[in-house]
From Swiss-Prot:
Binding site for Zn(2+): E123, H148, E152
Transmembrane segments: 5-25, 32-52, 61-81, 137-157, 171-191, 195-215, 236-256
Organism expressing this protein natively: Escherichia coli O81 (strain ED1a)
Name this protein carries in UniProt: Zinc transporter ZupT
Iron is among the record's keywords: yes
Subcellular location: Cell inner membrane
Chain residues that bind Fe(2+): N120, E123, N149, E152, E181
Name of the coding gene: zupT
Family: Belongs to the ZIP transporter (TC 2.A.5) family. ZupT subfamily.
Catalysed reactions listed for this entry: Zn(2+)(in) = Zn(2+)(out)
Keyword Cell inner membrane in annotation: yes
Pfam families: Zip (PF02535)
Amino acid sequence: MSVPLILTILAGAATFIGAFLGVLGQKPSNRLLAFSLGFAAGIMLLISLMEMLPAALAAEGMSPVLGYGMFIFGLLGYFGLDRMLPHAHPQDLMQKSVQPLPKSIKRTAILLTLGISLHNFPEGIATFVTASSNLELGFGIALAVALHNIPEGLAVAGPVYAATGSKRTAILWAGISGLAEILGGVLAWLILGSMISPVVMAAIMAAVAGIMVALSVDELMPLAKEIDPNNNPSYGVLCGMSVMGFSLVLLQTVGIG
């Protein structure tokens, strides 16, 4: 099994961490969740804008028009799909109301699972493609995706457990969204692995960079602010950028990058 595929599987499996937290009742503080989402956004933004997009534009045979065009395509494609697909957001379920209605909250959790699954599928492809092109960047993207999958698993498992009383059912529903990400990585491994050219890989990387930027500014940062309105998510973003930037410099210094 390839290392990029293993990274994709591990990133998707992080959903189960949130699921177990949801059924065990040991919910992390809103401040910690918000910081982790901002941290993940910082990692994605730095890797996308400072590494992936420049690398795609510098690839042999890649024209600036195609490179920037694919980046914009990734941006607009994410926003378009996000607006077209009706789904609840994780913060809607993480905020516990007094005596929630079991049937209503279960239906909302199922809709959330569907929405997260559809949105996680391309994330799996993005993680695999990035790691295949540059393993160093793949580790960073896998870490960022894993951090943002934990509250997603928590957001689904907690309400389903409250509605059904079944830990197994709650973990199952939460795990489906993580499995969708793994499926995306497996399909990318099967379809793209042997027949992709350097130019096509660079074009996909540019589009993935656009998707990651859109995900960071449209989903992760606003979600962090909604989960913890009293703190600025920018601190998490800056920490994520700093840690990722330092790690990239360190890896390049020792000759890994």
